[in-house]
Amino acid sequence: MIDIANTVPSAFYNSNTSDRLPYESRAQAIAEVSLPYVFRADGSDGGTELFKSVSQSFNGRQINNLKAKMGMALLPPATSSFRLKPDALAMVQLFQGNETAIERVRQNLSLNTDAISSEIENQQIRSSLFDMLLQQIVVGSVIVEKNERAGMTIFPLRTFVVKLDSRGEPLAMCIVEKLQKLPEGITPKDEKEEYELYTLLALDKDTNKWIMKQDIDGDAVGVEKTYKDYDALPFRYFGWNWVQGDAYHRPFAEDYYPDMQQVDKLAKLNTEGAVIAAKSVLLVNQRGGRTRKKDLTDAANGAVIDGHADDVTAFQLQKNFDFEVSNSREGIIKRELQANFLDTGSVQRDAERVTAEEIRVMAQQLEASTLAGVYSKMALKWSKWIVTKVMDELNITFDAVDVDVLTGLDALGRSQEAQKQDNFMQRVTSLQLNHWIKENEVLQRYASFDGINTVGLIKTSQEVQTEQKAAQEATAERTLVEEGAKSAGQEAGKAVANPQAGGPQ
């Protein structure tokens, strides 16, 4: 831990940039063979020619594919990426079987889930999530700031330094921002066209709390703030792979950089070779033959000139076999990269007829085996943090019952839970044991699997009881009327059959 009280943010930043250099070089090398704009060379600007270093778009497409799939998994558009799960034991102890109270809690959870999901969409957090994932795939480390009710701000590697503990978690981080307009509450000592604002966040060794302090040109600005723990900070550091002894996290693409580099070199070789091989050049034997180059050049299409066919030949590179070798190698590496970056194009087997169902099944198997590990790296750290931040902004609290925010595979495992319940219900039906099942509980569970808001959709227990009572009363009344009509009919029949009954004898 650092002595935050005696540490100047700008001095801390400048003294730790040297540890960052190897990770900058690694990120730039990966970007140069994939998406150069993600990590541009130091000193480049909007006028710099970015794609001079790259010879193909394949690597960039794989990175964008993985980014899209991870983004859709972390923030799926059709359902919530999290679950609000109440403490089951507390529910039993508190409500003691009161189904009306339990339904009220579930409706409250459903409404809050919708409110959180809507707020995430309104703040356009999804687009910032894609930018953050891109940084982690190509660069490895990134810092995110959650702006209150205003989405997120992404800070790439060249804008911050960090100190990590023995588990790869941050102990201190400092961010530099180049601003023309300073945030509210920060007054500089001197007026400038552009300011460099340094923000230091560090764990205080004495209080075990996080402190945030800022400076411009070494002069303290703003108000020093204290946060109870790391989760309370508006800033959060995210990294991909970390190895003991590393100063920063390593990117996902580093594992596959040799293959990406080979694809780029082979693509350049095959492209340049194809251009040369496709070049149309005619060779004319003027000295020993009867054909003149000028006659051939000036001849119109379909013209007749003096000459001999053997005097004219077309240039041929005759490197077809060599290009087949390089093309084959490029194809093999591309298929391996497609599998590693979750591109479903890699699952299609080399055959004349491949059904869509076959591709779908193989793609599901690929993503089930690979995406689970990739996705789990981000779900708990990012999803739970962002959901908690949005809940704080919306002042959503649960006082009666403790509620856990489930993210990651626990949240996305709802389809498997629904399938298990389907199988269970089929088995119960086959055994003719449906009378043991609480229908309302079944409906609530199915709705929770898909994140459906049940408020106003599913009847409450009280409504069902009222309807059942009304139906029973209607049935009883109908039965009474029918029995009365039947009795009256029987009496009338007796009177017709025996008209003298009751008369004088």
What is the role of each PLM region?
Residues 1-182:
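Extended, helix-rich architectural segments
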Residues 96-107, 116-132, 247-257, 317-324, ...:
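Generic amphipathic alpha-helical segments used as scaffolds and interaction surfaces in large
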Residues 13, 138-139, 145-299:
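Structured, contiguous alpha/beta core segments that scaffold functional sites
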Residues 2, 110, 114-122, 131-138, ...:
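A broad, structural surface signal
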Residues 36-63, 120, 177-211, 295-317:
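An N-terminal domain-start capping segment
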Residues 1-25, 38-42, 283-505:
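C-terminal anchoring/interaction modules
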